[in-house]
Regions:
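Low-complexity segments
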Residues: 1-59
Length: 59
């Protein structure tokens, strides 16, 4: 998924990052946002939904 685009049909499944996890993560690059999906933190462009990074929280 990194380097690809988040599927439009799945955008509704992106959730805010759990507050207790947010303090452990580096800030996203300027212009990008982070969301939570299925155990992963997804760093993405909120306009194009281009995925720049994934962080596995279950590992």
């Amino acid at each position: 998924m990194v380097g690809g685009y988040y599927p439009y049909a799945d955008i509704g499944y992106l959730q805010p990052i759990p507050p207790d996890v947010y303090g452990y993560l580096p800030p996203p690059p300027p212009g990008y946002q982070m969301g939570y999906y299925d155990g992963y933190v997804v760093v993405y462009d909120p306009i194009t939904y281009f995925i720049t990074n994934l962080i596995d929280l279950m590992q």
